[in-house]
Amino acid sequence: MNQSTLLNLSVLVLFLPLLGFVITLLLGKKFKAIYLFEILILISAFAISSVIAFTKLNYFTDINLVEEFEWINLNNMPIVGNVPIVLGIMLDNISVLMLFVVSLISMLVHVFSIAYMKGDLRYNRYFAYLGIFTFSMNGIVLTHNILMMYIFWELVGLSSYLLIGFWYEKKSASDAGKKAFIVNRVGDLGMFAGILILFTTYKTFTFDQIFYQISQGNLPFDSGFWLTVTGILIFSGAIGKSAQFPLHVWLPDAMEGPTPVSALIHAATMVAAGVYLVVRVFPILTGDALTFIAIIGALSAFIPATIALTQNDIKKVLAYSTVSQLGYMIMALGVGAYSFAFFHLITHAFFKACLFLGSGSVIHAMHHEQDIRNMGGLRKKLPLTYATFLISTLAISGVPLTSGFLSKDGILAGTFAFGNLTGNWIFAFVGFFVALLTAFYMFRLVILTFHGEPRDQHKYDHAKESPFVMAMPLAVLSALSIFFWYTPNPINADQGWFLSKWVKAPELSTPVESRYNFMKNYSEEFVEANTHEIVFSESYTEAMHEAHIPAMLISLLVAAFGILLAFTMYQWKKISADKLADRIKPLYNISLNKWYFDEFYNAVFVGGTLLFAKFLAWFDAAIVDGVVNGSAALTRGFSKFSGKFDSFVVDGLVNFMAYLSGFIGLLFRRFQTGKVQTYLMLVVFSIVILLFLFKSF
């Protein structure tokens, strides 16, 4: 298979879900089983993406395949001049891996939804929305320029709004859809500003051309500071889409959508798009920008993990877990663990999708009950769901022999190496502490849901294992949470095919003055500003290697402690969770109330907006209406004056002229007698007067 065939197949994978969306939406009311066409489309897209990934990763490993064409030509535009706008797709190792993941999970979610959404009044429309979402996400993955990425980025936002608010009859669902849409607009606005700075500076949207020009020393406004600002602005799009602090508040509310949607959008694809964006623009990020990114990632990993400790809605526990794990990935990128951040993006997509679909299986069996306090003992009723849920929980907790152990260990090693190199250990501390919290709250979830005795006997008695179309995706996703798909070594992924062959360190574009910490820089290993170099310094690479064993041992200890603590409190009940909550009531309330972010935003932004609206209403009524009413009164007064002036002056003058004309006419009418003698006398009299006058001169 040659390169052009791979590119053509990738275009087919891109547009197949769009075809499914159009057909399903248009024919959904006429053909009840049209959803099967959409599912067939997704199965085909997955099969093709598998072929693309296998061929690219094995036969074109170190070659980036690009296909592009000129869309429009901007002639004589202000600032940028004449610029062609090029559209295209790029197949590199990262994009084909993401394409495979998106296609696989989307297909499994489609299959799972056959049974889960059965009986819904808008059954076909639901599958149509899944199709447009998959198309949008594939577009983000395949594009080779940031303009196309932004277009598909907004399409993902639209389709997620449709899916989150799918049950719009519920006020909570419609509010959640609006909240997600509005909060994401905040981040997208910053991203758009960053894109505009790049375009006005480099006259192109294509990633490779932007990277090349930066490597040549061409910086926005000739300043490294503005390159940092541009990187942070683009990252703000990831803050919104990946639900990072402080724009993380929309994701838990988005659980109002159908549970399979949560697996697709909020675990595997949409929220992963933000991390993918940072991975894609990584070469232009300066040291300052990466430090900012690491701080945001650390806060996003820590805060939601503390919130997940006290949540009782099965989906919201997983939602806050998702935000925390995404924060892990963002923090990893900020401290230089680039490959492991992307590795964790892939592994997390599988086990978190399995957890969400597993929660859907539980909710389906419990007749839409989501409160884990009303569950218990379900491992006997749902053995397959329990087994797959447990495997995925072990993976997210970082237990050996799972994929999560390998990827999380790499991230923790990265923070450890960063601390060794810079003396800044805060990121390592956050990483290990969050690993402990993750193991604790995830096993709390497993124990309260599946272990112990039933707490709602009626629902427990009617619970039964999910049908095959729901169980099969769980089995596939849990199997992909095992280590051997990524490396033959169960404790170290460095020499596995995923990291050693497929995902390699990126090249630098940033100038030497903007590099520090884990980057090559002039004080350590001098490189010219106009050359492409692998991003990592030798000392950082050595620090990463040295950090592997201690990071692995510490991560095992904290994971074991978290799991043991969960069993002690909720399985064996040696420690009373209620008594502990009473002892630390202030901290418990902070966690239970989600750090009061929603209350703060409602008070400051929503309340502030409403207060500003009231001020504008007052200003409109008192000032604007006053000016308008005053102008109206002035106009009325002037019109009355004009009326009087017209009546007395203008009309008076006209009437006077008419009267004068009449008077003169009356005067001269006396001479019009009709007698020739009289006229002759007047002529003679006139001649006499004229002669007299001429004689006088």
State where each predicted segment sits.
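Hydrophobic alpha-helical transmembrane segments of polytopic
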Residues: 10-17, 34-48, 95-102, 126, ...
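Aromatic-capped, Gly/Pro-kinked transmembrane alpha-helices
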Residues: 80-84, 491-557, 568-697
